């Protein structure tokens, strides 16, 4: 990164395994569905009598929320019972982590309600409390300040989104979540990854962090002088670099597009309004348009001075607007920089341009929308165009594999108001003594504890800690020898991921290893089973019965070697193992192969 004005901060969220925060339900679930119910959430005012922009936006989307009640949720998650007092183990863990991060611990824990009406909480708000403030960590590029350590409830897990309805599972709602927020002291994307790792060590070392694929999530706060962008829910450390690189390119593009539009005379909002052009498209052969006309009508609007900026060369304003309309349930939009296209011919679009009195430098947007949505969408698109051109880029965005997409406006203080069901909690001596028993340590101490606990080398322990694989090591070591578990995590799985260009959920790998352990299979059989999983995507229950896991006897190995020699293949002690692997699917003990050579 070469931009001088870049500022980066992180908000890192860690799920805890202590039991849910405001009820006595466990955090884990068998996945059993008990029943479902629906809710419609409406915006409310903050304690200052204002309505938050993000909450207003979600309210205008007018969606229905369906909730799946699971075996680890109760009436508290359904918002039919008041919350219980917060989980003391979770509080003690949060205090331990805050202390390790050099924070000042507050004398009182005061919960607040944060208005959230995207459906991720049945109540329409999330409960959160500050535990510690004014901390810091030392890094290779200087001190990074920790602004707050909070303890809050996690959101419901989105399962499905369909026309006008979002389906959530309550299995995740209410899981304790430690949120650690930094000041914008991070210099570049590599530094962001380093900071995220260092903070992660302090939480993982407590032994209280949950072992699940989505148990750690990063929100990346980014600015290069055009307002703060929050990239919410980055699940992988490697993804931090990619989304930051994309966001720099995106904001560079928007700056250039803004300069060009202003040079031309700017965007005239008074001329931006949708007119019905369905009559001009009734005879089109475009499948895209005809499909949209089955459930709505065609509308077009003039975007003064936007020609060439919607999609041409490096400009991509059209994508910015398409992300917005998708949030309102539309599939996207068509615009003049891509037309003719999508089956629309020049004879289809020229009458639209004529009706709008389009000039050479003007752009045109075409929407296929139900009539009842076009009013609010018109206002939101106009607002967004003006916002982008003025370079007010502050908003919440979501990560994709290598980019970001618009989620909602940036929320602010107007979404906060006091919690009325949970009393203020004094941080007593008992709570502090409980937190003293929970050890939160940095990288070096974590490596030392791994070596002591599992008897593995310092190099391997550092690799596991650096790759944040301590929880996986703990899980695998219940089924395998710790040294073999470390080998699987640091060598076997990375090798197979690279060889077969695929990744598997850790839970699936653990299921396979557990089944192998139940049958007393050795390390060679475990490694062969993992290769079958990666190469064939086979059910673990079937893999354990695969005949390729039957180990060759010494006589069988010697027989294969003799046949290979007779066929003219030169076999030595140096190459016998690699030659055998190419000529048999079954596993074998390498030492036996060497013995066959005398």
Swiss-Prot record:
Pfam families: GatB_N. GO terms for biological process: glutaminyl-tRNAGln biosynthesis via transamidation; translation. Its EC number is 6.3.5.-. It catalyses: L-glutamyl-tRNA(Gln) + L-glutamine + ATP + H2O = L-glutaminyl-tRNA(Gln) + L-glutamate + ADP + phosphate + H(+). GO terms for molecular function: aminoacyl-tRNA ligase activity; ATP binding; glutaminyl-tRNA synthase (glutamine-hydrolyzing) activity. GO terms for cellular component: cytoplasm. PROSITE patterns: GATB. It is an enzyme of class 6 (ligase). It comes from the Archaea. InterPro entries: Asn/Gln-tRNA_amidoTrfase_suB/E (IPR017959), Asn/Gln-tRNA_Trfase_suB/E_cat (IPR006075), GAD-like_sf (IPR004115), GatE (IPR004414), Gln-tRNA_amidoTrfase_suB_CS (IPR017958), Gln_synth/guanido_kin_cat_dom (IPR014746). Keywords: ATP-binding, Ligase, Nucleotide-binding, Protein biosynthesis. Allows the formation of correctly charged Gln-tRNA(Gln) through the transamidation of misacylated Glu-tRNA(Gln) in organisms which lack glutaminyl-tRNA synthetase. The reaction takes place in the presence of glutamine and ATP through an activated gamma-phospho-Glu-tRNA(Gln). The GatDE system is specific for glutamate and does not act on aspartate. Heterodimer of GatD and GatE. Belongs to the GatB/GatE family. GatE subfamily. NCBIfam families: gatE_arch, PRK04028.1. This is Glutamyl-tRNA(Gln) amidotransferase subunit E. The gene is gatE.
């Amino acid at each position: 990164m070469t931009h001088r004005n870049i500022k980066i901060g992180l908000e890192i969220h860690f799920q805890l395994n202590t039991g849910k925060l405001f009820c006595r339900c466990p955090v884990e679930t068998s996945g059993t569905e008990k029943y479902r119910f629906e809710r419609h959430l409406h915006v409310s005012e903050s304690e200052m009598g204002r309505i938050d922009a993000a909450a207003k936006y979600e309210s205008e989307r007018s969606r229905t929320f369906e909730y799946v009640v699971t075996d680890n949720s109760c009436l508290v998650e359904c918002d039919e019972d008041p919350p219980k007092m917060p989980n003391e183990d979770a509080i003690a863990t949060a205090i331990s982590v805050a202390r390790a991060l050099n924070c000042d611990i507050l004398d009182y824990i005061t919960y607040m309600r944060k208005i959230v009406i995207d459906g991720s909480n049945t109540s329409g708000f999330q409960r959160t409390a500050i535990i510690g403030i004014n901390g810091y960590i030392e890094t290779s590029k200087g001190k990074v300040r920790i602004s707050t350590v909070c303890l809050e409830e996690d959101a419901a897990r989105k399962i499905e989104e369909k026309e006008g309805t979002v389906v959530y599972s309550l299995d995740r709602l209410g899981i304790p979540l430690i949120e650690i927020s930094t000041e914008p002291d991070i210099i570049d994307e590599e530094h962001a990854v380093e900071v995220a790792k260092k903070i992660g060590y302090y939480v993982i070392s407590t032994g209280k962090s949950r072992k699940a694929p989505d148990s750690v999530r990063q929100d990346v706060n980014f600015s290069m002088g055009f307002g703060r962008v929050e990239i919410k829910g980055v699940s992988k450390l490697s993804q931090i670099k990619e989304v930051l690189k994309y966001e720099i390119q995106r904001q560079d593009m928007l700056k250039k597009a803004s300069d060009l539009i202003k040079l031309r005379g700017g965007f005239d909002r008074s001329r931006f309004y949708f007119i019905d052009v369905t009559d001009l498209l009734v005879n089109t052969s475009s499948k895209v348009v005809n499909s949209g006309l089955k459930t709505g009508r065609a509308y077009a609007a003039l975007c003064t001075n936007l020609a060439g900026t919607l999609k041409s060369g490096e400009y991509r304003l059209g994508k910015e607007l398409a992300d917005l309309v998708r949030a309102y349930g539309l599939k996207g939009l068509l615009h003049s920089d891509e037309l003719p296209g999508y089956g629309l011919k020049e004879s289809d679009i020229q009458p639209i341009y004529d009706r709008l009195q389009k000039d050479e430098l003007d752009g045109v947007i075409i929407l296929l929308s139900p009539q009842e949505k076009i009013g609010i969408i018109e206002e939101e698109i106009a607002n967004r165009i003006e916002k982008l051109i003025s370079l007010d880029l502050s908003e919440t965005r979501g990560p994709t594999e290598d980019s970001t997409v618009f989620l909602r406006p940036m929320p602010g203080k107007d979404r906060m108001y006091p919690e009325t069901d949970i009393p203020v909690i004094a941080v007593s001596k008992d709570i502090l003594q409980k937190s003293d028993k929970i050890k939160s340590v940095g990288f070096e101490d974590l490596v030392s504890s791994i070596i002591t606990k599992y008897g593995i080398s310092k190099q391997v322990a550092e690799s596991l800690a650096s790759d944040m694989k301590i929880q996986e090591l703990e899980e695998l070591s219940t089924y395998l020898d710790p040294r073999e578990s470390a080998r699987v995590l640091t060598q076997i799985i990375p090798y197979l991921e690279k060889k077969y260009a695929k990744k598997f959920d850790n839970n699936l790998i653990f299921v396979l290893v557990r089944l192998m352990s139940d049958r007393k299979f050795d390390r060679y059989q475990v490694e062969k089973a993992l290769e079958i999983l990666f190469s064939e995507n086979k059910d673990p229950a079937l893999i354990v019965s695969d005949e390729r896991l039957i180990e060759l006897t010494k006589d069988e190995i010697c027989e294969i070697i003799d046949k290979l020699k007779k066929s003219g293949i030169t076999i030595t002690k140096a190459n016998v193992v690699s030659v055998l692997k190419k000529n048999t699917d079954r596993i074998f003990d390498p030492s036996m192969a060497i013995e066959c050579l005398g």
